[in-house]
Amino acid sequence: MSSFLSKRFISTTQRAMSQLPKAKSLIYSSHDQDVSKILKVHTYQPKGSAESSILLKTLAFPINPSDINQLEGVYPSKPEKVLDYSTEKPSAIAGNKGLFEVVSLPSGVKNLKAGDRVIPLQANFGTWSTYRTCESENDLIKIEGVDLYTAATIAVNGCTAYQMVNDYIEWDPSGNDWLVQNAGTSSVSKIVTQIAKDKGIKTLSVVRDRDNFDEVAENLEKKYGATKVISESQNGEREFGNEVLPKILGPNAQVKLALNSVGGKSCTNIARKLSPNGLMLTYGGMSKQPVTLPTGLFIFNSIRSHGFWVTANSKRDPENKRKTVDAVVKLYRDGKIISPKEDIRTLEWDVNNLSDEGVLDLVNRGIATKGAKNMVVLKW
């Protein structure tokens, strides 16, 4: 009898040890332009066990435009909807990027330990959740030596900036090479100027006209290393382009790269500043206007125009994604670049005290706040 009870106790204990903690996630099973109609808070018991799965505790996740576009159903990359979360309909967990802490891991995992901070290697990970599980350490990238905000956004802002500057142009170290970019106040642009400065590349950043233009320009030049900041009206003025710009660039300047995340007239005007054989990379379209380029730039200046999508790059070459993250982390740790933290708006998710309705309201407010860069930080 005692032997039977002993075996039963051991069996019960083993099951208890194997069970993963319940996760609370923001899920969706359909799409809508009004994402508040389809986003739900759902608590479920994750599949798998502590002996087979890496258990991750979420520390923070950004609310990016790509996350919202996925919920709307208009983003090219979408997670598969599945029945793994104890839902009536196939569902997906929202969120692509985020920072996690390793809670526990199977004995076979060699390169991670409890307490390590990690980010997903690929998109569609489902980061808007208290806990996530991962079956392979190869699907994670370890992050050390940078702050929470930087780590949670590095896969988007840092990797985008680094790859655009480093992977497309053969730069001349003489100091005469330039790049031009619109959306000069964006987080990506602020990182671009710093990476470029570290490589000896000069930057011309274009920003929207505003009452405090001089203040904004001074901040971008002194804090983030832009060589020169101009307004969109200057960007489009023929007189400025013919008379003032050559003095800014210098006699031997080569504008080899244009970075476009706006489209429309802004895109046309930065393309006009490219030197012959220059390249324009388009990585966004904030104006929702098409990329419009004069025919003469192609025929007489032989410029090139390509799209850039960091998600596709990561999927095509995962190893380069790892190398990019490592390189960007090193730049941060060496003090070569800093994160534009003043742009961020922090939303706190108190895991132990915030109700489901409160969590949903918190995230929906972050989604609805136009122009803000929202970061949800989980308080444990």
UniProtKB/Swiss-Prot annotation:
Its main location: mitochondrion. It catalyses: a quinone + NADH + H(+) = a quinol + NAD(+); a quinone + NADPH + H(+) = a quinol + NADP(+). It is an enzyme of class 1 (oxidoreductase). Residues 1-17 form a transit peptide. SUPFAM superfamilies: GroES-like (SSF50129), NAD(P)-binding Rossmann-fold domains (SSF51735). The keyword NADP applies. One of its GO terms (molecular function) is NADH:ubiquinone reductase (non-electrogenic) activity. Homodimer. This is NADPH quinone oxidoreductase. It comes from Kluyveromyces marxianus.
